[in-house]
């Protein structure tokens, strides 16, 4: 089996048969099931959410995470090949899967409690639940040091106030991982559920790029969450930065995917 598309540097020789098979599986899914429907969604600025469970069935959500954490337990190389093929279909598709796996499933797997893992990871890995990552705000990019969103401790609860901007999957999400600074200026991660009082989202329309990706603003006004919603095993900037490191691996594949799109 060989790498699909141009292989000027004989990269196929560096890949395992499993990795090549996984790439072909992703390639066939994009070519046969995704490309026929993407044009309409691109024009309308919508995402075909009905494919989420198919992505889960194929193991494309959090692929490199262990199976007990909702992933497929494949190599990081295989995960990269999956994202490469999803990007070939559309940037919105790659972004959807990358956020779900690298920015939502990964931090729950790495920093969450056992209860949080049991509650969220199976559904997220299956594509039955959708997640988003709330870091960027309107006055700064993905720079956690400039964060204005706050988390104030009140007994066994936290009160979250602030907003997040340019959030992929925002209005689609059943759970949002929102990063906020506590009263000591320590960055902490909280799992906010759709429908919580004071928690809302508003989609951003008229984009020139990533049109098939749902991008939203998240608003938190005195949102009360129990302490059990806080990621217990991480605090400080390492939390969001480690998630971004996971996601940037997928972003690097864009530069390969675009020129190979015709293949």
Predicted features and spans:
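A glycine-rich, basic-preceded beta-loop-alpha segment at the flavin cofactor/substrate interface
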Residues: 2, 76-78, 195-198, 214-248
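A short core secondary-structure module
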Residues: 161-201
